[in-house]
Amino acid sequence: MRHFMFEDYDTGEEFLVCACDIEEAFIIARDYFADPSYICEVDEFEAESSGLDEY
């Protein structure tokens, strides 16, 4: 699985989505936030050490 970082425009919250590809990650992000914006892909270490919520 890959880790994708997003930011929600409405709340300003940054969060991670664990998914197979960016399309799946967007679907998951939209399930939890109204207006998510993709930032970048991070590796396993960055995801674990970021302290961000992961969906």
Regions inferred by a protein language model and the residue ranges of each:
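Short aromatic-glycine-(Arg/Gly/Cys) micro-motifs in beta-strand/loop hairpins
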Residues: 1-13
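Short, mixed-charge low-complexity intrinsically disordered segments
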Residues: 31-55
